[in-house]
């Protein structure tokens, strides 16, 4: 019997694995947006619609995992962090899937195609947001290893490095957003005002997925200091 089994037998089923599964599902939702964004940029609306449907299904599955974890999470458990901490991370993770679904829905309903001046920049931003989410997933997946090693100094350094990577990628996404907004600002006068408003909204929502991924890492970091 390994150490993880011993922990489970002593303190009940660990909530860590369900949290990791939820983050994996959330990340798959954002990854699918990359497919959607490419299709929309090419005005391949049939392919975009398929990706949009897939995003919706993935978000629903993430929601099911979230509700299952919340319902089965004991009020107290023998972990070096609180139930509230775990629920906070869960809700932040879930916001990534929610924002992704809303963003794809907005772009699909309006058949949104960005001006050529920054269309590729938007795709680059989506890639950065996906990378940020992936880095947060890697960090969360290290949580059970931390517990098994009793928060050893070596393992903490590994996790700290992972969280630093999340922060760096999120900063890159901020820079990318600013670049797109600056380009859009220069084009505003030549574009329909309603389109401009929704372009800004789409850029903001996409950036919020990276912000949420960074918050997952930050919250994780706070949990480790308690």
Q: What is each residue range found by the language model?
A:
Residues 1-226:
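Cytosolic, long alpha-helical scaffolding segments
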């Amino acid at each position: 019997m390994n150490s993880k089994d011993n922990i489970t037998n002593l303190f009940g089923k660990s909530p860590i694995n369900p949290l990791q599964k939820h983050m994996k599902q959330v990340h798959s939702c954002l990854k699918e947006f990359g497919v959607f964004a490419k299709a929309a940029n090419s005005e391949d609306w049939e392919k975009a619609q398929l990706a949009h449907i897939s995003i919706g299904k993935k978000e629903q599955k993430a929601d099911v995992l979230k509700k299952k974890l919340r319902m089965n999470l004991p009020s107290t458990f023998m972990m070096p962090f609180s139930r509230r901490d775990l629920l906070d991370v869960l809700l932040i993770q879930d916001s990534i899937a929610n924002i992704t679904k809303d963003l794809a829905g907005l772009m699909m309903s309006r058949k949104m195609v960005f001006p050529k001046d920054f269309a590729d920049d938007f795709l680059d931003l989506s890639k950065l947001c996906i990378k940020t989410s992936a880095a947060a997933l890697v960090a969360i997946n290290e949580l059970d290893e931390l517990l098994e090693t009793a928060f050893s100094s070596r393992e903490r350094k590994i996790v700290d490095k992972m969280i630093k990577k999340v922060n760096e990628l999120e900063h890159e996404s901020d820079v990318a957003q600013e670049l797109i907004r600056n380009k859009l600002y220069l084009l505003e006068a030549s574009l329909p005002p309603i389109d401009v408003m929704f372009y800004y909204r789409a850029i903001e929502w996409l950036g919020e997925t990276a912000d949420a991924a960074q918050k997952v890492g930050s919250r994780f970091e706070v949990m480790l200091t308690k």
